[in-house]
């Protein structure tokens, strides 16, 4: 499982270094093979171990293709998916088109989301995190089922 937010640097060639604390798990789960695609809701990228992405693909494949919204989601997620592999230094190359989509510049946030990571522009991530915290702290903003989750 992937947890935590990590500030990492995008180098001049468009590569990011995976923090060492995640490398062993990625190696054991998918031999360092990853899939990156757009997030269809937020202006970020989703980075999956290959084994996890294959589960997503199976669900997408099973969607009824006569529904336009299903085809749209398939086009967005599968059409933008790119195979990646960690190199010997634990780095991976983010394709230019995907970097542009997420507005990734020098400073990037790698955010663990249990079964995947999100890649955010650092400023966008910080603004979203601040907005999320402010929204959840408003009286009555949290549904009862979520309130029970908070320790």
Swiss-Prot record:
Compartment list: Cytoplasm, Nucleoid
Pfam families from the UniProt entry: MraZ
PROSITE patterns, sorted: SPOVT_ABRB
Top-rank taxon, per record: Bacteria
UniProt-recorded name of the protein: Transcriptional regulator MraZ
Keywords for the protein's UniProt record, in alphabetical order: Cytoplasm, DNA-binding, Repeat, Transcription, Transcription regulation
Protein family: Belongs to the MraZ family.
Limits of the SpoVT-AbrB domain: 5-52, 81-124
Organism: Pseudomonas savastanoi pv. phaseolicola (strain 1448A / Race 6) (Pseudomonas syringae pv. phaseolicola (strain 1448A / Race 6))
Gene: mraZ
Subcellular location, principal: cytoplasm
GO terms under biological process: negative regulation of DNA-templated transcription initiation
Any one GO MF annotation of this record: DNA-binding transcription factor activity
Subunit (UniProt): Forms oligomers.
SUPFAM superfamilies: AbrB/MazE/MraZ-like
GO cellular component, one term: cytoplasm
């Amino acid at each position: 499982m992937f947890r935590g937010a990590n500030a990492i640097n995008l180098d001049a060639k468009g590569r990011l270094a995976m923090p060492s604390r995640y490398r062993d798990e990625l190696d054991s789960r998918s031999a360092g093979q990853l899939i990156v695609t757009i997030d269809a809701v937020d202006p970020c990228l989703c980075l999956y171990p290959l084994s996890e992405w294959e589960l997503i693909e199976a669900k997408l494949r099973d969607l009824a293709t006569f529904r336009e919204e299903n085809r749209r989601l398939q086009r967005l997620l599968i059409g933008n998916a790119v195979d990646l592999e960690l190199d010997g230094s634990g780095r991976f190359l983010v394709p230019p088109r995907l970097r542009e989509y997420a507005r990734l510049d020098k400073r990037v946030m790698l955010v663990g989301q249990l079964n995947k990571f999100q890649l955010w522009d650092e400023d966008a991530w910080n603004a979203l995190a601040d907005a999320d915290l402010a929204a959840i702290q408003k009286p009555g903003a949290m549904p009862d089922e979520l309130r029970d989750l908070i320790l």
